[in-house]
Amino acid sequence: MARVIDKEEKRCDIALSAITLFCEKGIQQTSIDQIAKSAGVAKGTIYLYFKNKEEIVFTIWDILTQQHEEVFYKRINPNMSAKEKILEYYNFSECQEGFDKEQTLILFQHFVSSMLIDKTSLYTDYFESFFKKDYDFITKYLYEGIENGEFVIDDVELLTNSIIMLLKGALIKAKASNMGFDEAQQILTKHITYLLEQCTRKVL
């Protein structure tokens, strides 16, 4: 008997089938017809699961984000410092498992590009909520570092926003310099480490 696929699983399958298209053609240049063909479904079926192409894009990112968070919480432990936890949060090495890591980098770059030219506020609103999660996470562990005597920070909000801006800048730098995933990851880790060391003072 054929396996029953629930609606959410089918929705995820359709969204994930669009990754290669988005990476090769770009989000703006990819049509619903092409996504339907890639997913092996009729165009009308796409609209049973998604209102528009943007929902497909956001579903992909929700899937990647959920996977990243699950892996992160498995990797950390109570003995890790706040600095180590922040660096681990921005370690995207699990992209090698289940997803093509180079495609993941290209996809994120396309996401940011779409946000920059967005006139509908759909991308802007989505990524605002996405970076808000990053903000809350970084702030949590910076204060944890303060409380456990790991370091002293003059301005937690400024440091938090600087780390988030660094992530965006690293994506643009990777694109401009034609970096692969591994090199981009090394650059991101190096600069976040430097930023944390320069903007925190160890408690004496």
Descriptions of predicted regions:
Residues E8-L16, Q28-Q29, Y49-Y73, L87, ...:
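An amphipathic alpha-helix adjacent to DNA-recognition modules
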Residues E69, K74, K119-N148, E157-N161, ...:
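Amphipathic alpha-helical packing segments from all-alpha helical-bundle domains
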Residues C95-F99, K140, E144, T160-D182, ...:
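Amphipathic C-terminal alpha-helical segment
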Residues G40-F50:
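Short hydrophobic/aromatic patch on the recognition helix
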Residues M1-K25, Q29-V41, E55:
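Basic, helix-initiating cap at the start of DNA-binding domains
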Residues K85, G98-L122, I172:
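Amphipathic alpha-helical segments used for helix-helix packing
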Residues T59, Y73-Q103, L159-I163, Q185-T189, ...:
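Hydrophobic alpha-helical connector segments
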Residues E24-I27, L48, N77, N148:
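Helix-turn-helix/winged-helix DNA-binding modules
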